[in-house]
């Protein structure tokens, strides 16, 4: 080794761990460096979220250094230094202190006196004032960037930081009102996801920020590291390439391996000859890193990854299962789901070209399949039995759990997210246990009836003979009944919970279980019992949830081998299924078997109806295409292919037939004469599908060689495009002919234009996609996969719903011409029929953007919907019409209807707008306030009164009460109420210069009295008169008071807190009832128009119905998670909820037993076709109560 090389190594040592200095010679610049600098220079809010030891801190140091050289003022806040035990006041003071120390403010302000003088302010107000009056005013006209490192540490704080992240969003929104804010930018760094950091999705800054992707080093980016290798430049580059092949460019590992290689080269322990470099580096990595990795893990790296993977016991099973699947398959499609995102944050896997793969071979070697199995078995209480069941190909029922072991396993699993095989095992165990449970319950019911007869008889006899002992005997009698009811309730509760889990993987059996439990519960309870008195509630909840989501309508049995294809005719919606057993079965849409068609030798791979639905064609393994009529007559056999025929398709006029084959050709036939019109060659592998365009002028073929070819009807190639690295299995034309949906073996569906441009890539399947089909209106599509999943997509590429649970590959997928019937054929010999008609209780509003604010009004059946960069929509829930308010500001933060629904108030920042909606929508007034933060608002006005009032709950701890009058101007026969006066607000507040004022979180105006109620951050409830006099202040909740609402009749006040309780108060402030729900915050409340019913919604989407006496009367689960809006309809008969994704869900407001009866009836009605269809024993259920005589 030359002295020059040695000196170079000594002057540029590698740094393993920690942040690199801005001018460190081994710093390798990546694309993230360039993007972060460009975005920050443009004044954007940026965030860099990635796993540990990926170079985030080094990136921050480098970016700060370069910006400072440009004259930008930079400051870095390290969240770790603030600790995790501080209260909000101390934490925010710590932020202000770090800003003071890090910025050139020394001598400009005395910080400690400044903080003391503002003790009465809330923490976020104090931070805002410091930024606005000290930082922006003191630091001239220079740009300021605030870097915040280790932001994930805030997750350990005992209080919410929604306000902090909302403030970042405020700073960017404030630019429209105050140009000084254009100089201020933020950059966040950490190991987290945006959804981890802020609960309030309407106030998140991350949807206006720029995510900076931080990837591993490429060879070009890593070249500065080669300077430290004591060899010539060519050898150094080659060695670096081998190192990156092992590390995947992971910065920490790359530095560590470079250091090991450099040391070995210095000592002469490494042969750098070109032909041996790969082998010697592999040996070095095996010896120094992989072997005995626990002792070699210095600085700690691998243990950090393992700890992050295993630390959350509720989620670790799911993460391990997902990682196990990636190890087994090599890669799976990336869908950016929560579990995939969390797994990526461990650092174990990386997203590459739409695929989730192991990050590098070193991780694969350390965290290998054996390590995963070992950790999974540590987690699972049933690991041994599960493995034995898997080894038996899922057949050994003796390995399934029973009794107490099953209950313990379900209890353990209830709080965890597990892998698919776990749920499959528990589901199979539950199915087996269910049969025994139902039989036992029937025996218990019969015994109960017998016991009642015997005890009643005994009471009569003994009362006659014992006299005074009758009371004791009566008590024993009722105690016996109570015990039996409790036992039945316990079992029914378990069955109801089991039904929901079972439904996830097998829809009809899940519904059957819920029906069995619901029917038994219906007979067990009395009409006058409230839900809180029920011995079990899960049957009712599970029935509601299942019936709002179920799609599976019927299961058609009879094939003796896997189903390869299904088709639905335009004539009577008849269903044809083709199978490897060499037959086609024909069914009615209700599931009645019509006939079997035989004639092929070997498997049948495809079936397709003619456009008029009167005939169909089949493609066979025997190299033939056959044409049949519906009566079973063979009309034609087409011969010419030299290998198996994989698909057949009729032209729109029904005269031409296209077939594809394993012989690498497509043939066009005049099927009536049997004549071959053209043979389309050029494919280099099997051709799996071909389809005519809607106008019949073009044929598209897709091939396993990754090519898509367009042909005219004369057989001439029009165009060819594709992706040579993938194989295509299916294709479908958009109804207007402007798009092609193509199913691929990489788990994606791609949407191409006929010109060869990819418009969207739909990722979500875990294995290759087999079929794809557009809905008739072209707005949506369905795809199926070899792993047994079906996904419902929007044409824009959004995944609407993923259906899982099929144990085998799905090769058949067909949609009826009305879009309401979906047929699915799978390798398990079954055809499943789904009803895709929209559920009456669940409507997707198909909104063009993310919802930001929602307001509902019962009187007018109207929902106001505000979105990002879209007009305000008024949606009528009765007739489902839409009205657009084009004069509304976009990106509204808040909306509020008046109680009569004739007025609508909107807010964005400091700007307010008021509309009158009586006849036609009219923007009446736009004004601005000096309020920087409003948490809640209420609006009161009536057609009979000229007075109106607006109350605003502010972050400064005040309520601002605005009042005005309407000037009734007559124009023709139409009276218009226009507010012409806006009085200065009355400011209502508790506290003084010594007592700190907490932010007001909620406010409500009494419907008739000049009175309002307000709730603050600490759970205090305060009542005021409109003249500003205080009525009463009460400690109402133990935490933030989230919601307040006076009843429409004005007789009571409803409050809801973050600690999960709601309370009913008199208008004088006396506590009447406490509604106990759960520990989760209550985000939404509603009161029916007649004030008889109350609804609350928790942050997890659980909606509860109460009466005004505080009795729990119903529980409903939102299928879309947390809600943005909740209200009753005008008649108070339905409860309506709006979710973030635009789903509108409704539930009936009826007494419990009647609702349960209706649900059982609805479930039986759903299964009518299924129960009437002859089934194999495994799919047979009696459900005698679903028969007409049992109702």
Curated annotation (Swiss-Prot):
Keyword Repeat: yes
Secreted recorded as keyword: no
UniProt-listed Pfam families: AAA_35, WD40
Keywords: Repeat, WD repeat
Protein's UniProt name: Uncharacterized WD repeat-containing protein slr0143
Lineage summary: Bacteria, Bacillati, Cyanobacteriota, Cyanophyceae, Synechococcales
WD repeats: 558-588, 599-629, 640-670, 682-712, 723-753, 764-794, 805-835, 995-1025, 1036-1066, 1077-1107, 1118-1148
Species for this entry: Synechocystis sp. (strain ATCC 27184 / PCC 6803 / Kazusa)
InterPro entries tied to this protein: G-protein_beta_WD-40_rep, P-loop_NTPase, WD40/YVTN_repeat-like_dom_sf, WD40_repeat_CS, WD40_repeat_dom_sf, WD40_rpt
Coiled coil: none
Highest taxon listed in the record's lineage: Bacteria
PANTHER family, alphabetized: TRANSCRIPTION INITIATION FACTOR TFIID (PTHR19879), TRANSCRIPTION INITIATION FACTOR TFIID SUBUNIT 5 (PTHR19879:SF9)
């Amino acid at each position: 080794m030359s002295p020059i090389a040695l000196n170079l190594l000594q002057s540029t040592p590698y740094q393993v761990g920690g942040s690199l200095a801005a001018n460190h010679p081994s710093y390798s610049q990546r694309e993230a460096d360039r993007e972060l600098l460009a975005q920050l220079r443009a004044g954007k809010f940026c965030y860099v979220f990635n796993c540990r030891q990926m170079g985030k801190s080094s990136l921050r140091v480098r970016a700060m250094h370069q910006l400072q050289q440009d004259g930008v003022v930079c400051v870095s806040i390290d969240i770790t230094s603030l600790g995790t035990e501080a209260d909000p006041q101390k934490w925010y003071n710590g932020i202000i202190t770090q800003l003071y120390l890090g910025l050139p403010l020394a001598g400009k302000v005395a910080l400690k006196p400044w903080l003391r003088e503002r003790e009465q302010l809330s923490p976020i107000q104090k931070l805002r004032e410091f930024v606005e009056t000290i930082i922006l005013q003191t630091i001239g006209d220079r740009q300021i960037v605030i870097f915040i490192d280790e932001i994930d540490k805030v997750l350990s704080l005992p209080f919410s930081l929604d306000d902090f992240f909302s403030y970042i969003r405020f700073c960017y929104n404030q630019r429209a009102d105050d140009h000084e804010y254009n100089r201020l930018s933020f950059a966040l760094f950490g190991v987290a996801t945006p959804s981890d950091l802020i609960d309030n999705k309407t106030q998140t800054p991350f949807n206006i920020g720029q995510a900076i992707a931080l990837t591993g080093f490429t060879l070009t980016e890593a070249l500065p590291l080669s300077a430290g290798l004591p060899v010539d430049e060519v050898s150094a580059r080659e060695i670096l390439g081998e190192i990156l092949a092992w590390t995947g460019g992971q910065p920490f590992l790359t530095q560590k391996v470079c250091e090991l290689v450099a040391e070995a080269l210095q000592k002469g322990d490494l042969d750098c000859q070109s032909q041996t470099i790969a082998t010697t580096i592999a040996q070095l990595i095996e010896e120094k890193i992989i072997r005995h990795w626990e002792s070699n893990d210095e600085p700690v790296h691998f243990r950090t990854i393992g700890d992050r993977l295993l630390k959350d016991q509720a989620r670790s099973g799911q993460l391990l299962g997902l990682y196990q699947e990636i190890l087994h398959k090599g890669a799976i499609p990336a869908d950016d789901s929560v579990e995939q995102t969390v797994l990526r944050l461990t650092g174990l896997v990386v997203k590459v070209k739409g695929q989730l793969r192991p990050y590098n071979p070193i991780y694969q070697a350390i965290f290998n399949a054996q390590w995963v199995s070992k950790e999974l078995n540590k987690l699972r209480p049933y690991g041994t039995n599960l493995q034995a069941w898997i080894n038996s190909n899922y057949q050994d029922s003796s390995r399934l759990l029973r009794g107490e072991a099953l209950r313990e396993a379900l209890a353990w699993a209830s709080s965890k997210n597990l892998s698919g095989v776990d749920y499959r095992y528990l589901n199979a165990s539950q199915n087996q246990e269910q049969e025994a449970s139902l039989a036992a319950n029937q025996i218990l019911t019969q015994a109960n009836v017998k016991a009642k007869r015997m005890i009643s008889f005994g009471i009569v006899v003994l009362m006659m003979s014992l006299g005074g002992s009758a009371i004791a005997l009566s008590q024993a009698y009722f105690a016996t009944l109570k015990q039996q009811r409790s036992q039945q309730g316990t079992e029914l509760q378990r069955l109801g919970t089991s039904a929901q889990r079972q439904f996830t993987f097998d829809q009809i059996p899940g519904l059957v279980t819920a029906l069995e439990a619901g029917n038994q519960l219906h007979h067990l309870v009395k009409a006058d019992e409230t839900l809180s008195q029920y011995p079990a509630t899960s049957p009712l909840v599970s029935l509601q949830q299942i019936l709002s989501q179920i799609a599976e309508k019927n299961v058609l049995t009879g094939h003796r081998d896997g189903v390869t294809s299904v088709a639905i005719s335009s004539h009577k919606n008849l269903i044809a299924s083709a199978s490897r057993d060499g037959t086609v079965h024909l069914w009615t849409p209700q599931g009645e078997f019509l006939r079997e068609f035989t004639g092929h030798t070997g498997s049948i791979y495809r079936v397709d109806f003619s456009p008029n639905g009167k005939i169909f064609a089949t493609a066979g393994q025997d190299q033939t295409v056959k044409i049949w009529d519906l009566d079973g007559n063979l009309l034609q056999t087409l011969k010419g292919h030299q290998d198996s025929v994989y698909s057949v398709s009729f032209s729109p006029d029904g005269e031409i037939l296209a077939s594809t084959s394993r012989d690498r050709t497509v043939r066009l036939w005049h099927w009536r004469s049997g004549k071959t019109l053209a043979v389309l060659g050029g494919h280099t592998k099997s051709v799996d599908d071909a389809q005519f365009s809607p106008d019949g002028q073009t044929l598209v073929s897709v091939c396993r060689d990754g090519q898509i070819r367009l042909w005219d009807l004369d057989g001439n190639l029009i165009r060819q495009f594709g992706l040579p690295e993938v194989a295509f299995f299916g294709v479908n034309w958009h109804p207007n002919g402007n798009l092609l949906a193509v199913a691929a073996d990489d788990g994606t569906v791609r949407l191409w234009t006929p010109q060869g441009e990819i418009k969207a890539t739909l990722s979500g399947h875990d294995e290759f996609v087999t079929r794809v089909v557009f809905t008739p209106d072209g707005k949506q599509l369905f795809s199926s996969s070899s792993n047994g999943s079906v996904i419902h997509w929007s044409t824009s590429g959004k995944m609407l719903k993923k259906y899982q649970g099929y144990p085998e590959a799905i090769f058949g997928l067909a949609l009826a011409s009305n879009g309401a019937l979906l047929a699915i054929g799978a390798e398990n010999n079954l055809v499943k029929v789904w009803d895709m008609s929209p559920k009456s209780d669940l409507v997707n509003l198909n909104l063009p953007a993310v919802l930001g604010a929602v307001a509902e009004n019962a009187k007018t059946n109207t929902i106001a919907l505000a979105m990002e960069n879209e007009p305000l929509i008024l949606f009528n829930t009765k007739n489902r019409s839409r009205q657009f308010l084009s004069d509304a500001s976009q990106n509204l933060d808040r909306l509020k209807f008046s109680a009569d629904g004739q007025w609508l108030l909107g807010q964005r920042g400091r700007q307010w707008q008021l509309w009158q909606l009586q006849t036609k929508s009219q923007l009446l007034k736009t004004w601005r306030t000096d309020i920087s933060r409003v948490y809640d608002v209420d609006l009161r006005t009536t057609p009979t009164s000229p007075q109106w009032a607006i109350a605003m709950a502010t972050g400064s701890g005040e309520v601002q009460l605005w009042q005005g009058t309407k000037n009734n101007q007559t124009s023709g026969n139409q009276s218009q109420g226009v507010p012409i006066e806006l009085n200065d607000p009355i400011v209502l507040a508790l506290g003084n210069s010594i007592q700190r004022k907490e932010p007001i979180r909620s406010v409500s105006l009494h419907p008739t009295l000049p009175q309002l109620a307000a709730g603050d951050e600490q759970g205090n409830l305060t009542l005021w008169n409109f003249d500003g006099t205080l009525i009463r202040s009460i400690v109402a909740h133990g935490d933030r008071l989230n919601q307040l609402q006076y009843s429409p009749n004005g007789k009571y006040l409803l409050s809801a807190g973050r600690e999960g309780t709601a309370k009913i108060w008199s208008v004088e402030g006396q506590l009447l009832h406490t509604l106990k729900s759960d520990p989760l915050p209550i985000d939404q409340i509603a009161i029916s128009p007649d004030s008889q019913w109350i609804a609350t919604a928790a942050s997890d989407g659980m909606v509860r119905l109460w009466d005004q006496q505080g009795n729990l009367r119903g529980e409903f689960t939102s299928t879309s998670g947390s809600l943005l809006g909740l209200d009753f309809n005008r008649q108070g008969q339905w409860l309506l909820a709006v979710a973030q994704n635009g789903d509108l869900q409704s539930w009936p407001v009826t007494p419990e037993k009647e609702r349960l009866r209706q649900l059982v009836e609805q479930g039986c009605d759903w299964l009518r076709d299924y129960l009437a269809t002859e089934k194999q024993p495994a799919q047979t259920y009696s459900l005698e109560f679903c028969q007409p005589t049992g109702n």
